[in-house]
Amino acid sequence: MTKKISSAQMRAARALIRWTALDLARASKVGVATIRRAEVVDGEIPVTLANEAAIRRALEGAGIEFIENNGGGEGVRFRKTQAFKKRK
């Protein structure tokens, strides 16, 4: 099962890809008020499972990878793509 996104991860992901709350709302088809409300809390975002899935898909589609808390803390990063792979 995929761990829920935290508000800190959501804010950090938007910052990495330089999206506004409106950009994320449009990409995820989730209301901008829902995006803003989700980002002001600490911890897991208080949205429906369907909205969280839509937000995750939009951010992952923009190249974001979510990092679970594995002792080093949760976070986000750019997903490794073909362009970043070392050439042989």
Regions found by a protein language model. Name each.
Residues L49-F66:
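DNA major-groove recognition helix of helix-turn-helix/homeodomain DNA-binding modules
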Residues Q9, T34-R37, A58, G75:
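Residue-level recognition of specific faces of alpha-helices
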Residues A13, A27, A38:
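Residues in the recognition helix of alpha-helical DNA-binding motifs
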